[in-house]
């Protein structure tokens, strides 16, 4: 399956651009996503996760099961109740909303660089008193030093112009004993470098896992519904590009997962000193 002309141009420019330009381009893309797709039933933007565990969900959350399961996989080994929690790259807010009502943190702030996505999330989830969304840059987090208990990041960091700066920012903002829950995809050389970035920032790695199979299983399960949703709600000239970014079957990211050229990872880390 072809990427679609907008996605091809976007990918080429990303490869040759410096970090600041890449940040601007991703911001532009996600602003466009938010404006083009304002349906209230489109609240998640991740690839999903499917394993042998059956997560108990409410009837209203069931249609988003696989997307919620990715969030749950990322944060399930830490205790969020009564804690101060941040999501970096909160998108349309579906994951943060579910975590805020399910795990009952004292306060959960979702930061995203798309002003339109932040606006939609604040509108949709205004009734959740422990949840808020703010516009923010992952490489310059508007957080005090040593102020947060848990920071999590889901399928977002591959967009950042300088992921090392992001990791250092998270370390700065966490309290001693605080956790970073991170999940995203990388090729092998880039993941090896990122592993060293985590260590060099001062994090102790509590656990790590390759979850590519579980993500692929989810992508296969929701492929037809994604294609149908894009077909019904996205302008004709953008359909293939949306399919590429959604990771539907036959697109470059999906095929890279299948071929073993891209892997999806999950890391749990602690700021030990």
PLM regions and their residue ranges:
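A short acidic, Gly/Pro-enriched loop at the edge of an enzyme's catalytic core
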Residues: 139-151
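A short glycine-rich, Lys/Arg-flanked "PGG" loop and its adjoining helix->strand segment in the class I
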Residues: 164-176
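Conserved alpha-helix/loop element of class I SAM-dependent methyltransferases that forms part
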Residues: 64-81
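N-terminal auxiliary segments of SAM/dcSAM-dependent transferases
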Residues: 1-42
């Amino acid at each position: 399956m072809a990427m679609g002309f907008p996605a091809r141009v976007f990918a080429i420019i990303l490869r040759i651009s410096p970090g600041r330009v890449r940040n601007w381009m991703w911001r532009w893309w996600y602003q466009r996503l938010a404006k083009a797709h304002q349906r209230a039933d489109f609240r998640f933007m991740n690839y999903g996760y499917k394993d042998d565990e059956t997560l108990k969900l409410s009837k209203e959350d069931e249609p988003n099961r696989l997307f919620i399961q990715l969030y749950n996989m990322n944060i399930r080994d830490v205790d969020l109740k009564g804690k101060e929690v941040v999501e970096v790259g909160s998108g349309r807010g579906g994951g943060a909303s579910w975590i805020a009502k399910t795990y009952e943190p004292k306060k959960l702030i979702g930061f995203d660089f798309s002003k339109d996505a932040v606006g939609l999330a604040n509108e949709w989830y205004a009734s959740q008193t422990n949840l808020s969304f703010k516009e923010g840059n992952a490489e310059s987090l508007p957080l005090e030093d040593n102020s947060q208990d848990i920071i999590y990041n889901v399928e977002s960091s591959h967009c950042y112009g300088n992921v090392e700066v992001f990791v250092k920012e998270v370390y700065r903002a966490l309290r001693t004993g605080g956790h970073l829950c991170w999940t995203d995809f990388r090729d092998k050389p880039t993941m090896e470098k990122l592993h060293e970035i985590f260590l060099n920032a001062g994090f102790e790695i509590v656990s790590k896992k390759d979850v590519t199979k579980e993500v692929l299983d989810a992508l296969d399960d929701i492929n037809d519904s994604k294609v149908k949703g894009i077909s019904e709600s996205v302008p004709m000239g953008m359909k293939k590009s949306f399919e590429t970014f959604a990771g539907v079957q036959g697109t470059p990211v999906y095929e890279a997962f299948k071929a073993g050229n891209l892997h999806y990872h999950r890391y749990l880390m602690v700021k030990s000193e």
